[in-house]
Structure formats: structure tokens, C-alpha cells
UniProtKB/Swiss-Prot annotation:
The gene is sucC. This is Succinate--CoA ligase [ADP-forming] subunit beta. Mg(2+) binds at N199, D213. The keyword Kinase does not apply. Coiled coil: none annotated.
Amino acid sequence: MNIHEYQAKAVLAKYGVPVPSGHAAFTPEEAVAKAKELGGPVWVVKAQIHAGGRGKAGGVKVVKSLDDVKKEATRLIGSTLVTHQTGPDGKEVNRLYIEDGSSISRELYLSILVDRATSRVSFIVSTEGGMDIEEVAKKTPEKILSFSVDPASGISGFHGRKVAYALGLEGDQVKQGVALIEKLYKAFVTEDMSMLEINPLVVTGEGNLLCLDAKVNFDSNALYRHKDIVELRDLTEEDPAEVEASKYDLNYIKLDGKIGCMVNGAGLAMATMDIIKLYGSEPANFLDVGGGATKEKVTAAFKIILSDPSVEGILVNIFGGIMRCDIIAEGVIAAAKEVSLSVPLVVRLEGTNVDLGKKIMAESGLPIISADNLADAAEKIVKAVKEAA
């Protein structure tokens, strides 16, 4: 789960992480009022969307008067911001963050993430922070360094010193860096984050470390332990279909293809998407119904797939272990009738009660194409979509 920058900074501030003073604003008038509270004389007006690259897209502006605060707030609120992370459609700006301006001596980069290859928490740092960090990663990857922390032993002073020296900090800044690393690590672990990015982490003109931006992603599987974090969720920033899927505990991710997929198990879902590409088409989504889907859950999954207007065909690929194939068949039939299915549907079932499941579909009176294996299913759905075009 993602949250906005201003929310991320509030979470980090609870752990003593140094962040600039600032306030969220939802109207130009509120932006001016919040700027007055901060006092100035320099403010930063920041668009709040769940995407990076805001600065280059005009979503972050430094201003030196209240009139300019209002001008930029008026320009941004209600506008659509297009960045390299939003895609061509962009994201609508519904809120701003009005922040104190800061004097900047150096811009650094620091992030923490879960390294699934090593099962450790990794720090990624660079002396080249700021808006061009992606270019740094592409052209001069040697300027980006990483260090890992064994979760069994946790963070120690030498980790902080290692990061501080890698960032080129000197004197009192090293002490600040060590303290900052320990605070960020504590926040990361305690709040069950999966990613924490500070870009830029700056050295101010006074020689202090300050987190000018913060991007946080939380492990969705651990949200039950953090009711306060769940309350920060902004559904307007998420795909409506993905929000609907989460209500039924479905793992759904929209893609750009035209063949909808409904599969049980992440591995089988990825294999299904791969074989669709192998047979010359593109998957429209990743959808894992899990191992304990009910008839209602399958019906909901079907509706979510068909809510995407680009879907021209559906492939259902189920291996019935915990899940029974007859339940899947009943759900598919109920959903097809409820939505008046008008696109080709190929169903491949295998496992528990597979014969009963196939019998239910065969006697449904619906034009459901049955497949014997994964390759057969992919070939049939790609062919059916082409013939229906």
C-alpha cells in the first residue's frame, strides 16, 4: 500500500527523522492559510500523487510570496500531472503539501527495501540524489552503492557509519547520519514497510541532514497490524478495479493486453500470461483468485475482468487442489449469465472434481470452450479472439 509524501513524513517524524515543517492543503485558499502558518519567506508547493517524477512534470514549485502560493495551488489542484511513472493518462491532483523552503548544500539519495534474493533489508545510497537519480542508475551505476542488514542481528552503529561514509558525510554529519540510519531502520521494520525512499536527502546550508522527500510502500500482508496506516489509504489514487478486487481478497493487476485471465496461484497466473504471449497475444490482467474461492468470489472476479473495456476474451485456468473445479464452474456460469457475456471464454480445469466441473459447464447452455491443457487453452483463446474481431 502506498501513501502520500506528507503522510510518509508524518510517519517518519514519529521516529525522530528530520523533515521540514509542512501542511496538507485541498484548496488554494487553504494552501495560502497553511503557508501563513509556516511563516515563510520561502515555501515549496508540492502536488500529492502516488507517483515519482513530480518535479520534472511541474508538480513541485518553490515560491517566495503568498500570491505565488495561491497561483501555483490554483494551477495544480484539479490538474492532471503526467510523469514517467503515471503513464500517458497521468494522475489528477486533489491535494497539495505546503512546506517550508530549505537551503540546500548537497543532494543525496537513500532508500531501504526488502531484498527478496538475500532475505535481508538493504540500504541503497548515492551521492547523486535529486530528480535525475534514474539517469544516474542508467549511466553511472557505480555511483549507487548498497549494504544489507541481517534481520537477526538488526541495525548497528557500523551500518550507519558505512552509509555515512558512502554518502561523503564528514564531521558532525557522520553522527547525524548514524542516528538517521537507525531511526529510518526502526521506522521501516516497526511499520512493516517494504520500501522507503528518501530522495533527496539533503545537507542544508547549516550542515544538517534533512529528508526533503519521502516515498513509502507498506507490506499489504501486514496491514492488519497497523490500523492507523490503513486509515491513510487514498482510494482515489488506485485503480478502481484493483480497489474492488481487494474487497474480495483477489489479487488483481491491470495490464495492457486484450485477453483477461482468471487463475488460482501466482505461479500459474504468470505461466498463463507467458503462454498467452507465446501464442501471439497479450494478457489484459493478472488475477489470482487464491486457493479458497467461493462462487461469489469467482463471480466478482469475472465482473472485474469484464469491467476493462479492452478485454476481448477470457481464459480461466484453474488447478483444483483446495479449490474444487465444480465451484469454479458454477461461479463462471453465474458470472457469464449475470454480465451477459459477449466475448469468447475458454476454461481449462484440472484437479478436484474436474469431471463434475466440466459436466456443469457442458450442460450450462453457454458457449464455453473447454481446454484439456494450458497450451490448448492459450491456443484456443487466441484463435477465438482473432475470429471474433
